[in-house]
């Protein structure tokens, strides 16, 4: 384990050293973890967070499509509702809020792709990763189910918020969009939660959730026209299960394969290029 020393410059120009220590890699299988309440508390937090995330965001999508429906709102229907910008803000804003609320309990993953990337980087154990992903998928299904229950007259009519490949785009294009979008998200997660950054910015607790939420916002702006933006397999699965139409299931593999590949690339890039290269070049002083 390496213990690094980072120089910081307070007011007056004098530098003070601040130590930080990288946490040890999580064990692949930690059976003892199953006996701890903290694991189950974290799993519950992931379930509730993903439920709330899907409820708010899918309700926003359905509401926008209803407001912009020319058959319902004949006057300036195209300008009605929150628009794509508002949908992107709903997704990014909810991630910011929920990561802020759950980071100290579960790490605030709320996304199987994030959990998968952190597992590959040995940040979480296999047992925790599997339980998180199950909780996230179940939470997503329940969250979308609430939307359908509360907006039953609009839900099926406006597509149920399901991710589908838009007309005019090939499956390869959709897959590429999901890979790149998830890479941006997971890369941001690694950067925002880096131990060195946490040691430096620990007095500003919003600095981790803010860039993660903003990354989700930006990716949605870029990929909503292509796939409706997945980058979260639980989000795509939850809407497909409740909406349950052929089109949503036909493209479902894109919203699992793409995010998992993107997460794996982000994990490898951060762990074996950025962190490794910094150590080799001596960018940070080390007393280990």
From Swiss-Prot:
List the Pfam families.
MIP (PF00230)
Q: What induces it?
A: Down-regulated by chilling.
Q: Does the keyword Phosphoprotein apply?
A: no
Q: Membrane topology per the record?
A: Multi-pass membrane protein
Cellular component annotations (GO), alphabetically ordered: plasma membrane
Q: Where are the transmembrane segments?
A: 42-62, 81-101, 130-150, 172-192, 204-224, 254-274
Motif NPA 1, chain ranges: 111-113
Domain of life the protein comes from: Eukaryota
Alphabetical list of PROSITE patterns matching this protein: MIP
Q: Where in the cell is it found?
A: Cell membrane
Question: What GO molecular function annotations does the UniProt record carry, in alphabetical order?
Answer: water channel activity
Kindly state the positions of the motif NPA 2 in this protein.
Answer: 232-234
The family annotation for this protein states:
Belongs to the MIP/aquaporin (TC 1.A.8) family. PIP (TC 1.A.8.11) subfamily.
Q: What is this protein called?
A: Probable aquaporin PIP2-2
Q: What organism does this protein naturally occur in?
A: Oryza sativa subsp. japonica (Rice)
Tell me the lineage of the source organism: Eukaryota, Viridiplantae, Streptophyta, Embryophyta, Tracheophyta
Per UniProt, what is the name of the gene that codes for the protein in this document?
PIP2-2
């Amino acid at each position: 384990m390496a213990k690094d020393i980072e120089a910081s410059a307070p007011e007056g120009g004098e530098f003070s050293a601040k130590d930080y220590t990288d946490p040890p890699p999580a064990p692949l299988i930690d059976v003892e973890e199953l006996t701890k309440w903290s694991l189950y508390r974290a799993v519950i937090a992931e379930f509730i967070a993903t439920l709330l995330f899907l409820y708010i965001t899918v309700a926003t999508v359905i509401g926008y499509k209803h407001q912009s429906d020319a058959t319902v709102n004949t006057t300036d229907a195209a300008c009605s509702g929150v628009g794509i910008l508002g949908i992107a803000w709903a997704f990014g804003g909810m991630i910011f809020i929920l990561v802020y609320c759950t980071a100290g309990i579960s790490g605030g993953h709320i996304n199987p792709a994030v959990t998968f990337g952190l597992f590959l980087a040995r940040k979480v154990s296999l047992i925790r990763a599997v339980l998180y992903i199950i909780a996230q998928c179940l939470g997503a299904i329940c969250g979308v189910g609430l939307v359908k229950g509360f907006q039953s007259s609009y839900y099926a009519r406006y597509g149920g918020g399901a991710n589908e490949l838009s007309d005019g785009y090939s499956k390869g294009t959709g897959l590429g969009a999901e890979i790149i979008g998830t890479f941006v998200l997971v890369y941001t997660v690694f950067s925002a939660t880096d131990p060195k950054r946490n040691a430096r910015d620990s007095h500003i607790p919003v600095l981790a959730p803010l860039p993660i939420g903003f990354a989700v916002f930006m990716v949605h702006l870029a990929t909503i026209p292509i796939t409706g933006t997945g980058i979260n397999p639980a989000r795509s699965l939850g809407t497909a299960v409740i909406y349950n139409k052929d089109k949503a299931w036909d493209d479902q593999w894109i919203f699992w394969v793409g995010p998992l590949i993107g997460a794996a690339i982000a994990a490898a890039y951060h762990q074996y290029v950025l962190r490794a290269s910094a150590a080799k070049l001596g960018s940070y002083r080390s007393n280990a």
